[in-house]
Amino acid sequence: VKENKSWIFKKKQIEENIKKKKFILVDSRIQDRFEGRVEEPRPGLKRGHIKNAVNIPFKDCVDLEKNMLKDKSELEKLFNQKNIRNTDDVVFYCGSGTSCAVNAFTWYKITGKSPQIYMGSWSEFGKK
């Protein structure tokens, strides 16, 4: 197994994107965490989200009764509702770089594109 560095984004790239908006940043955490209405489960993190990010909670991509991803058409609709098109460049993050893998795989299912993830996620970017 060989790491593909083009799939993994660093904090510096995220900070540059806040200014230049080269890609869409998708926060995969629950809406209450995204909007800063609840405390973060990890100490030392502020509430909220990375500027310009859109929120698609990873659980919204899953059919909880079947315990699998929703149908492709449902997933496309979910992303389209957030003004994300198949041709967009998208980077996913979450709280720790784990649950955003669900959204990243969803993106692959929808588009066939290799997903990109900000591994540092909110646990790095959201430090007080």
Regions from the PLM with identified roles:
Residues 1-128:
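Cytosolic catalytic domains that perform sulfur/thiol-centered chemistry
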